[in-house]
Protein backbone atom coordinates (compact mmCIF):
# COMPACT_ATOMS: atom_id res chain seq x y z
CA UNK A 1 0.00 0.00 0.00
CA UNK A 2 1.21 3.51 -0.83
CA UNK A 3 1.68 5.75 2.21
CA UNK A 4 -1.09 8.39 2.59
CA UNK A 5 -3.50 6.42 0.36
CA UNK A 6 -6.05 3.70 0.79
CA UNK A 7 -6.11 0.66 -1.48
CA UNK A 8 -4.64 1.13 -4.99
CA UNK A 9 -5.06 4.88 -5.63
CA UNK A 10 -5.76 6.53 -8.95
CA UNK A 11 -3.47 9.54 -9.35
CA UNK A 12 -4.80 11.94 -11.97
CA UNK A 13 -2.53 14.11 -14.08
CA UNK A 14 -2.92 17.84 -14.49
CA UNK A 15 -0.83 18.51 -17.57
CA UNK A 16 0.04 22.19 -17.33
CA UNK A 17 -0.14 24.55 -20.28
CA UNK A 18 3.19 26.02 -21.49
CA UNK A 19 4.68 27.99 -18.61
CA UNK A 20 6.57 31.31 -18.64
CA UNK A 21 10.00 30.83 -20.18
CA UNK A 22 8.95 27.89 -22.36
CA UNK A 23 8.84 28.03 -26.16
CA UNK A 24 5.04 27.89 -26.48
CA UNK A 25 4.12 30.21 -23.59
CA UNK A 26 1.23 32.47 -24.61
CA UNK A 27 1.83 35.34 -22.16
CA UNK A 28 -1.22 34.79 -19.94
CA UNK A 29 -0.17 33.13 -16.70
CA UNK A 30 -3.46 33.74 -14.90
CA UNK A 31 -5.27 31.62 -17.49
CA UNK A 32 -2.76 28.81 -16.94
CA UNK A 33 -3.39 28.86 -13.19
CA UNK A 34 -7.17 28.90 -13.69
CA UNK A 35 -6.97 25.98 -16.13
CA UNK A 36 -4.89 23.92 -13.70
CA UNK A 37 -7.35 24.53 -10.86
CA UNK A 38 -10.29 23.50 -13.06
CA UNK A 39 -8.52 20.31 -14.13
CA UNK A 40 -7.72 19.42 -10.52
CA UNK A 41 -11.33 20.05 -9.51
CA UNK A 42 -12.50 17.70 -12.25
CA UNK A 43 -10.29 14.97 -10.81
CA UNK A 44 -11.68 15.57 -7.35
CA UNK A 45 -15.26 15.53 -8.63
CA UNK A 46 -14.61 12.31 -10.54
CA UNK A 47 -13.36 10.60 -7.40
CA UNK A 48 -9.62 10.37 -8.03
CA UNK A 49 -7.41 9.76 -5.01
CA UNK A 50 -4.71 12.32 -5.80
CA UNK A 51 -3.56 14.97 -8.26
CA UNK A 52 -0.12 15.39 -9.80
CA UNK A 53 0.95 18.48 -11.74
CA UNK A 54 3.58 18.38 -14.46
CA UNK A 55 5.02 20.97 -16.86
CA UNK A 56 3.84 18.85 -19.78
CA UNK A 57 3.45 21.81 -22.15
CA UNK A 58 7.03 23.05 -21.81
CA UNK A 59 8.61 20.94 -24.59
CA UNK A 60 11.39 21.04 -25.58
CA UNK A 61 12.43 20.36 -21.99
CA UNK A 62 15.62 21.15 -20.13
CA UNK A 63 17.33 18.56 -17.94
CA UNK A 64 16.63 20.84 -14.99
CA UNK A 65 14.02 23.56 -15.10
CA UNK A 66 14.62 27.30 -15.20
CA UNK A 67 13.90 29.28 -12.05
CA UNK A 68 10.83 30.84 -13.69
CA UNK A 69 9.42 27.34 -14.27
CA UNK A 70 9.87 26.40 -10.63
CA UNK A 71 8.34 29.69 -9.48
CA UNK A 72 5.37 29.24 -11.82
CA UNK A 73 4.73 25.68 -10.68
CA UNK A 74 4.94 26.74 -7.04
CA UNK A 75 2.20 29.32 -7.62
CA UNK A 76 0.03 26.73 -9.40
CA UNK A 77 0.62 24.09 -6.74
CA UNK A 78 -0.31 26.53 -3.98
CA UNK A 79 -3.49 27.53 -5.82
CA UNK A 80 -4.54 23.91 -6.24
CA UNK A 81 -3.84 23.16 -2.56
CA UNK A 82 -6.18 26.00 -1.62
CA UNK A 83 -9.00 24.78 -3.87
CA UNK A 84 -8.73 20.98 -3.84
CA UNK A 85 -8.53 18.63 -0.86
CA UNK A 86 -6.77 15.72 -2.60
CA UNK A 87 -3.12 14.80 -1.95
CA UNK A 88 -0.86 16.67 -4.38
CA UNK A 89 2.22 15.54 -6.26
CA UNK A 90 4.82 17.46 -8.27
CA UNK A 91 6.80 16.38 -11.33
CA UNK A 92 9.17 18.78 -13.08
CA UNK A 93 10.34 17.65 -16.50
CA UNK A 94 12.74 16.58 -17.46
CA UNK A 95 14.38 15.58 -14.19
CA UNK A 96 14.32 18.40 -11.67
CA UNK A 97 14.06 16.45 -8.42
CA UNK A 98 15.40 19.33 -6.36
CA UNK A 99 12.93 21.80 -7.83
CA UNK A 100 10.04 19.38 -7.30
CA UNK A 101 10.96 18.70 -3.68
CA UNK A 102 11.44 22.42 -3.02
CA UNK A 103 7.96 23.21 -4.31
CA UNK A 104 6.44 20.29 -2.42
CA UNK A 105 8.13 21.43 0.77
CA UNK A 106 6.90 25.03 0.69
CA UNK A 107 3.32 24.27 -0.45
CA UNK A 108 3.01 21.17 1.74
CA UNK A 109 2.46 18.78 -1.16
CA UNK A 110 2.53 15.06 -0.50
CA UNK A 111 4.82 13.43 -3.05
CA UNK A 112 7.10 14.05 -6.00
CA UNK A 113 7.90 12.07 -9.12
CA UNK A 114 11.53 11.75 -10.19
CA UNK A 115 12.11 10.48 -13.72
CA UNK A 116 15.74 9.44 -13.15
CA UNK A 117 16.53 8.98 -9.47
CA UNK A 118 19.33 6.46 -10.00
CA UNK A 119 21.45 5.52 -12.99
CA UNK A 120 21.59 7.13 -16.42
CA UNK A 121 18.99 7.66 -19.15
CA UNK A 122 19.66 8.58 -22.76
CA UNK A 123 16.92 11.00 -23.80
CA UNK A 124 15.96 13.73 -26.25
CA UNK A 125 17.51 16.12 -23.70
CA UNK A 126 20.80 14.22 -23.83
CA UNK A 127 22.28 12.13 -21.04
CA UNK A 128 20.37 12.48 -17.77
CA UNK A 129 22.01 11.34 -14.55
CA UNK A 130 20.31 10.27 -11.34
CA UNK A 131 19.65 12.78 -8.58
CA UNK A 132 19.49 10.45 -5.58
CA UNK A 133 22.44 11.98 -3.71
CA UNK A 134 21.35 15.58 -4.21
CA UNK A 135 17.77 14.77 -3.23
CA UNK A 136 18.79 12.82 -0.12
CA UNK A 137 20.98 15.73 0.95
CA UNK A 138 18.09 18.19 0.54
CA UNK A 139 15.72 15.89 2.43
CA UNK A 140 18.22 15.79 5.29
CA UNK A 141 18.37 19.58 5.32
CA UNK A 142 14.60 20.01 4.98
CA UNK A 143 12.95 16.96 6.60
CA UNK A 144 9.35 16.26 5.65
CA UNK A 145 6.83 13.50 5.00
CA UNK A 146 7.05 14.05 1.23
CA UNK A 147 7.31 10.70 -0.56
CA UNK A 148 9.55 10.08 -3.56
CA UNK A 149 7.99 8.12 -6.43
CA UNK A 150 10.78 7.20 -8.84
CA UNK A 151 10.65 5.89 -12.39
CA UNK A 152 12.52 2.75 -13.37
CA UNK A 153 13.45 2.84 -17.05
CA UNK A 154 11.51 6.06 -17.53
CA UNK A 155 9.61 6.53 -20.79
CA UNK A 156 10.93 8.56 -23.73
CA UNK A 157 14.43 7.24 -23.01
CA UNK A 158 16.91 4.48 -23.74
CA UNK A 159 18.53 2.49 -20.95
CA UNK A 160 21.72 0.43 -21.03
CA UNK A 161 21.49 -0.94 -17.49
CA UNK A 162 19.15 -3.92 -17.29
CA UNK A 163 15.71 -3.41 -15.76
CA UNK A 164 16.31 -5.59 -12.70
CA UNK A 165 19.52 -3.78 -11.72
CA UNK A 166 17.90 -0.39 -12.26
CA UNK A 167 14.93 -1.42 -10.16
CA UNK A 168 17.04 -2.61 -7.24
CA UNK A 169 19.36 0.41 -7.38
CA UNK A 170 16.43 2.82 -7.40
CA UNK A 171 15.10 1.34 -4.16
CA UNK A 172 18.21 0.15 -2.32
CA UNK A 173 20.61 2.96 -3.25
CA UNK A 174 18.28 5.71 -4.47
CA UNK A 175 15.91 5.32 -1.48
CA UNK A 176 12.69 5.58 -3.49
CA UNK A 177 9.48 5.29 -1.48
CA UNK A 178 7.69 3.81 -4.51
CA UNK A 179 8.68 2.86 -8.05
CA UNK A 180 6.92 3.79 -11.28
CA UNK A 181 6.87 1.45 -14.27
CA UNK A 182 5.70 2.87 -17.60
CA UNK A 183 5.41 2.08 -21.29
CA UNK A 184 7.88 3.44 -23.82
CA UNK A 185 6.07 6.73 -24.43
CA UNK A 186 3.28 8.87 -22.97
CA UNK A 187 0.03 6.92 -23.05
CA UNK A 188 1.67 3.63 -24.05
CA UNK A 189 0.81 0.52 -22.08
CA UNK A 190 3.18 -0.96 -19.53
CA UNK A 191 4.85 -4.35 -19.87
CA UNK A 192 3.06 -6.58 -17.35
CA UNK A 193 6.15 -8.78 -17.01
CA UNK A 194 8.04 -5.77 -15.64
CA UNK A 195 5.28 -5.15 -13.12
CA UNK A 196 5.43 -8.76 -12.00
CA UNK A 197 9.21 -8.60 -11.60
CA UNK A 198 9.01 -5.37 -9.64
CA UNK A 199 6.43 -6.83 -7.26
CA UNK A 200 8.71 -9.84 -6.77
CA UNK A 201 11.94 -7.97 -6.13
CA UNK A 202 11.17 -4.83 -4.12
CA UNK A 203 9.19 -4.16 -0.97
CA UNK A 204 8.03 -0.67 -1.94
CA UNK A 205 4.78 0.04 -3.81
CA UNK A 206 4.77 -0.42 -7.59
CA UNK A 207 2.86 2.21 -9.59
CA UNK A 208 1.84 2.06 -13.25
CA UNK A 209 3.04 5.29 -14.83
CA UNK A 210 1.44 5.24 -18.28
CA UNK A 211 -1.07 3.53 -20.50
CA UNK A 212 -3.73 2.69 -17.90
CA UNK A 213 -7.19 2.80 -19.47
CA UNK A 214 -10.69 1.50 -18.93
CA UNK A 215 -10.02 -1.63 -20.96
CA UNK A 216 -6.83 -2.77 -19.20
CA UNK A 217 -7.34 -1.59 -15.61
CA UNK A 218 -8.92 -4.87 -14.58
CA UNK A 219 -5.90 -6.79 -15.94
CA UNK A 220 -3.32 -4.46 -14.37
CA UNK A 221 -5.10 -4.38 -11.01
CA UNK A 222 -3.48 -7.56 -9.71
CA UNK A 223 0.06 -6.43 -10.50
CA UNK A 224 0.23 -2.84 -9.21
CA UNK A 225 -0.31 -0.79 -6.07
CA UNK A 226 -1.42 2.40 -7.80
CA UNK A 227 -1.99 4.04 -11.17
CA UNK A 228 -0.97 7.40 -12.62
CA UNK A 229 -3.56 8.24 -15.27
CA UNK A 230 -3.38 11.11 -17.74
CA UNK A 231 -3.92 10.36 -21.41
CA UNK A 232 -7.01 8.15 -21.18
CA UNK A 233 -9.05 10.61 -19.12
CA UNK A 234 -8.52 13.43 -21.62
CA UNK A 235 -11.05 14.26 -24.32
CA UNK A 236 -10.73 11.72 -27.14
CA UNK A 237 -7.95 10.04 -25.14
CA UNK A 238 -5.35 12.58 -26.31
CA UNK A 239 -2.80 13.87 -23.80
CA UNK A 240 -2.88 17.49 -24.98
CA UNK A 241 -6.63 17.84 -24.45
CA UNK A 242 -8.41 18.84 -21.26
CA UNK A 243 -9.83 16.26 -18.88
CA UNK A 244 -13.12 14.67 -19.89
CA UNK A 245 -15.06 14.36 -16.64
CA UNK A 246 -17.18 11.49 -17.98
CA UNK A 247 -14.12 9.41 -18.91
CA UNK A 248 -12.57 10.23 -15.53
CA UNK A 249 -15.70 9.10 -13.67
CA UNK A 250 -15.93 5.95 -15.77
CA UNK A 251 -12.48 4.69 -14.80
CA UNK A 252 -12.98 5.66 -11.14
CA UNK A 253 -16.22 3.68 -11.03
CA UNK A 254 -14.40 0.64 -12.37
CA UNK A 255 -11.60 1.06 -9.83
CA UNK A 256 -14.12 1.31 -7.01
CA UNK A 257 -15.67 -1.98 -8.10
CA UNK A 258 -12.25 -3.63 -8.21
CA UNK A 259 -11.43 -2.33 -4.73
CA UNK A 260 -14.44 -4.21 -3.39
CA UNK A 261 -13.33 -7.55 -4.81
UniProtKB/Swiss-Prot annotation:
InterPro entries registered for this protein in UniProt: BtpA, RibuloseP-bd_barrel
Stored SUPFAM superfamilies: Ribulose-phoshate binding barrel
Pfam hit, one: BtpA
Family: Belongs to the BtpA family.
Protein name, UniProt field: Uncharacterized protein MJ1115
Taxonomic lineage: Archaea, Methanobacteriati, Methanobacteriota, Methanomada group, Methanococci
Amino acid sequence: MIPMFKKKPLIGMVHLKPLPGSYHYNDNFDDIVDFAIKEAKKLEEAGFDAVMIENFGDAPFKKEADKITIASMAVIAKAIKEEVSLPLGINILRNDAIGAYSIAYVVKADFIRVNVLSGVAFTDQGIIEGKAYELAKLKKLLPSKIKVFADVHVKHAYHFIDFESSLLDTVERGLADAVIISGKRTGKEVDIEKLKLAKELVDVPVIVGSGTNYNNLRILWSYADGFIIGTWIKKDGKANNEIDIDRAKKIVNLANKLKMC
